[in-house]
């Protein structure tokens, strides 16, 4: 079982991602440079957060054109698991592997702090270890986390159960006040139609041990391992 962690110029969350994969959920993990063209050694790929290429043009707009993203598209087409976190989510939308896109936060400020998200679909490779409706405490850290899509796309996401998480209160209520960035319908994470490519705006890799304030983030990585191996990781 081996995970590839993509690294672009400006990626800054690869070390936390490496730690949770190796030390918390116990799988092999490698850093994969943005010039790589072959992902066949890997069972899953994670695109971590950061500010790739300094967010020039817009978040993810340059990274999506890196050579490794052609390999990611081929990997996903073969059914490989791909998880994009924060900037990784933005890159996946820019690459056309997930629908929609991102705007600057509606309040015009960078947002860094704890958020709560409600599990909307617990039957995906990224949420198997979660309960439907479970509230997770996971931090956000972004200036362009405002997910938007046209009405038809938003309708399809809901009808096809492609929404993984919505921002919510600690009690699980989806309210405007619980939305840290103005995302349409409080969307915090989605999955593609085939269920193997996911993007989340909060940072699960920053919430994997109680000493950090929450261990809820490890559920996403544990879910991926469970899907790939059948091994259930206690969290």
Swiss-Prot record:
InterPro entries: Class_I_gatase-like, PRibForGlyAmidine_synth_PurQ. Keywords: ATP-binding, Cytoplasm, Glutamine amidotransferase, Hydrolase, Ligase, Nucleotide-binding, Purine biosynthesis. Pathway: Purine metabolism; IMP biosynthesis via de novo pathway; 5-amino-1-(5-phospho-D-ribosyl)imidazole from N(2)-formyl-N(1)-(5-phospho-D-ribosyl)glycinamide: step 1/2. The active site is at residues 86, 203, 205. Disulfide bonds: none annotated. GO terms for cellular component: cytoplasm. It is found in: Cytoplasm. GO terms for biological process: 'de novo' IMP biosynthetic process. Its EC number is 6.3.5.3, 3.5.1.2. HAMAP family: PurQ. PANTHER family: PHOSPHORIBOSYLFORMYLGLYCINAMIDINE SYNTHASE SUBUNIT PURQ. Part of the FGAM synthase complex composed of 1 PurL, 1 PurQ and 2 PurS subunits. This is Phosphoribosylformylglycinamidine synthase subunit PurQ. It comes from Symbiobacterium thermophilum (strain DSM 24528 / JCM 14929 / IAM 14863 / T). The lineage of its organism: Bacteria, Bacillati, Bacillota, Clostridia, Eubacteriales. The gene is purQ.
